[in-house]
């Protein structure tokens, strides 16, 4: 009985204090290991009525890349057989504080799939959060100790995340129907 009480007290302290986020690897180098504390009160949240996006920054989901002008290849992500990201000339996303950030547009098999904005620093992340909450409503917060918010709609999924270690924020919206097509493609390729 004493042992059980000791274990329960230890687990309670561990939950209260948390686990250290840095560990040493076999070379003695410090590596970062994130610890996520679930938000037990979190519920799935949709977009505020009438605000679910059917694209991003004026580009509709599944629009063919060839239909757009001024797109410049930026990078390639190897996920799902390759997602090509582009920047659009003279294009930006306006944060809540008025700062403009570049937008990365992701295309899978030449079809528009996702829009993404990266921020640097807490001030700019908070401005992106302010803009997102104002336009789409407050997102679900799945973790108590992380700045992360999610929205799930009929055909769009949106996320807003901040990494306190790198001071980088990310805001993205992606097409759910395109995600399903991509997952089906990967499943076929594996067969």
Give, region by region, the residue ranges found by the protein language model.
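Bacterial N-terminal signal peptides
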Residues: 8-15
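Short, cysteine-centered beta-strand-loop-beta hairpins and adjacent loop/turn segments enriched
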Residues: 92-97, 123
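Hydrophobic/aromatic beta-strand elements that line small-molecule binding cavities or substrate pockets
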Residues: 101-106, 158-160
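N-terminal post-signal-peptidase region of extra-cytosolic proteins
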Residues: 52, 87-93
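Mid-length scaffold segments of soluble, non-membrane domains
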Residues: 103-120
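Non-cytosolic coordination micro-motifs
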Residues: 20-81, 116-191
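A broad structural signal for short, well-ordered beta-strand segments within beta-sheet-rich domains
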Residues: 74, 98-100, 112-114
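Positively charged n-region of N-terminal signal peptides that target proteins for export
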Residues: 1-4
